[in-house]
């Protein structure tokens, strides 16, 4: 997939994993690239080094096994010539079943490869507005400067740009105890029972509580959701109170000095809501109005709802339960939820500083802003989460842009691959778009002809299919 020298110039803004990967892949395809990085003249509050591709938090690139979605993504990146994976493998350190790197040597290797490439020129200056040059890739990361973020917001609409993420956990469908839950959207949409308020009062043994003012909005949300019913995990009063107490008492992740997270009232961490009062959640995301447990014919005291994460409903997210609890605490507390006692968590919840756009609303198939042709986004600003995913997004943005510049039909990786799954996530419309690590829910499910497989076996078959399809796609290029 390498090409001859090209007259096209591409500007890449940001020298992190996504920007470096994008610049390298474009240069490998014969394009002259100008990579603009503001260090050493200015650093984000998280940065301490002047090198490119600085890993500011963990040195781990997470699990290596192919039965792990990120492990599959790493293997795919190796097979397509990723610079980040090559440097990671060269600078790896012992980490059990994970791929971890010596972060100093890794950054040195990435910087050396970029600076030595004959078709890449590195400029050190700050970019405070979207450059006039086209095409341009913005890969400015989660701590994009206020000035550049303001320029982007002015171009796409402030409502489509977020300054921190609020991620709820995701559980696998296979791990839900379906004997304890039921499917129904509020007021009977997609479920069994619809009734007026008087009928609901007759069906429940608990006193009627005033409905919150957002009921009308939730009715609209349910109508827009079509026939896709939520999964409802019911609580009695004792279970609810114990759950709230556990949320309040749980250990939380301390905000890093550079984050300065300011919560929006409409997207508070669940433990913050719980701390405001015992009934806050019961009048918020856990309110049971419009829901009837078919096993009892009554409305539960409280309900935690799960929403499908993918079309095949192989995974569900915990609606409204974005959290800053430590991961071990999330496992302990969320397994108190009826039906989730043995839940497998595909993604843990988090809340942290993160500048990103509403990718499904804004980006076209080449990761290009529909409102600004020639402006492409890569990395965390597009809505991926994690080192490996950022490098993957840089790779994808580069190869799609290269195809576009050559007037070739776009040839994205198949949706059966992890690389294709990154694009699936960026294009999948959600009620509230949030960044995500790669999960199996982003990858096309197996054909039903495979029959019922145990979880690990299913993932292994999906990985085999992914690598087979990836190799065929890559060879055809």
UniProtKB/Swiss-Prot annotation:
It catalyses: uridine(54) in tRNA + (6R)-5,10-methylene-5,6,7,8-tetrahydrofolate + NADH + H(+) = 5-methyluridine(54) in tRNA + (6S)-5,6,7,8-tetrahydrofolate + NAD(+); uridine(54) in tRNA + (6R)-5,10-methylene-5,6,7,8-tetrahydrofolate + NADPH + H(+) = 5-methyluridine(54) in tRNA + (6S)-5,6,7,8-tetrahydrofolate + NADP(+). InterPro entries: FAD/NAD-bd_sf (IPR036188), MnmG-rel (IPR002218), MnmG_N (IPR040131), TrmFO (IPR004417). It is found in: Cytoplasm. Pfam families: GIDA. One of its GO terms (molecular function) is flavin adenine dinucleotide binding. Catalyzes the folate-dependent formation of 5-methyl-uridine at position 54 (M-5-U54) in all tRNAs. Belongs to the MnmG family. TrmFO subfamily. This is Methylenetetrahydrofolate--tRNA-(uracil-5-)-methyltransferase TrmFO. It comes from Sorangium cellulosum (strain So ce56). The gene is trmFO.
């Amino acid at each position: 997939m390498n090409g001859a020298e090209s007259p096209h110039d591409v500007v890449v803004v940001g020298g992190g994993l996504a920007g470096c990967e994008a610049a390298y892949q474009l240069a490998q395809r014969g394009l002259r690239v100008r990579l603009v990085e503001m260090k050493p003249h200015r650093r984000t509050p998280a940065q301490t080094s002047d090198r490119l591709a600085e890993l500011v938090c963990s040195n781990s690139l997470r699990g290596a096994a192919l039965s792990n979605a990120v492990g599959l993504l790493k293997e795919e990146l190796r097979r397509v010539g990723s610079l980040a994976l090559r440097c990671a493998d060269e600078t790896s350190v012992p980490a059990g079943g994970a791929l971890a790197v010596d972060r100093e040597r890794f950054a040195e290797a990435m910087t050396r490869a970029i600076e030595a490439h004959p078709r890449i020129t590195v400029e050190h200056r700050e970019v405070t507005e979207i450059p006039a040059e086209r095409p341009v890739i913005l890969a400015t990361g989660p701590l994009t400067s206020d000035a550049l973020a303001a320029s982007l917001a002015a171009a796409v609409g402030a409502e489509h740009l977020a300054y921190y993420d609020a991620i709820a956990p995701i559980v696998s469908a296979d791990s839900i105890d379906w004997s304890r839950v039921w499917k129904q959207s509020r007021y009977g949409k997609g479920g069994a029972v619809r009734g007026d308020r008087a009928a609901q009062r007759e069906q429940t043994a608990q006193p009627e509580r005033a409905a919150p003012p957002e009921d009308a909005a939730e009715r609209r949300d349910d109508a827009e959701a079509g026939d896709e019913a939520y999964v409802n995990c019911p609580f009695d009063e004792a279970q609810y109170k114990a759950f709230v107490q556990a949320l309040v008492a749980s250990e939380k992740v301390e905000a890093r000095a550079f984050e300065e997270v300011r919560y929006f009232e409409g997207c508070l961490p669940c433990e913050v809501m719980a701390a405001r009062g015992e009934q806050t959640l019961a009048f918020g995301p856990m309110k049971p109005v419009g829901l009837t447990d078919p096993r009892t014919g009554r409305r539960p005291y409280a309900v935690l709802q799960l929403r499908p994460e993918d079309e095949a409903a192989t995974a569900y997210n915990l609606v409204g339960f974005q959290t800053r609890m430590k991961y071990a605490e999330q496992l302990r507390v969320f397994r108190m939820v009826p039906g989730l006692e043995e839940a497998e968590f595909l993604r843990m919840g988090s809340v942290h500083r993160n500048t990103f756009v509403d990718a499904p609303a804004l980006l076209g198939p080449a990761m290009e802003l529909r409102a600004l042709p020639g402006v492409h986004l890569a990395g965390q600003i597009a809505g991926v989460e994690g080192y490996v995913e950022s490098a993957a997004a840089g790779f994808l943005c580069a190869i799609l842009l290269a195809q576009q510049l050559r007037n070739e039909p776009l040839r994205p990786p198949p949706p059966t691959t992890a690389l294709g799954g990154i694009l699936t996530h960026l294009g999948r419309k959600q009620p509230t778009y949030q960044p995500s690590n790669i999960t199996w829910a982003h990858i096309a499910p197996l054909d039903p002809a495979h029959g019922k497989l145990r979880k690990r076996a299913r993932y292994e078959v999906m990985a085999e299919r992914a690598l087979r399809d990836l190799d065929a796609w890559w060879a055809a290029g």
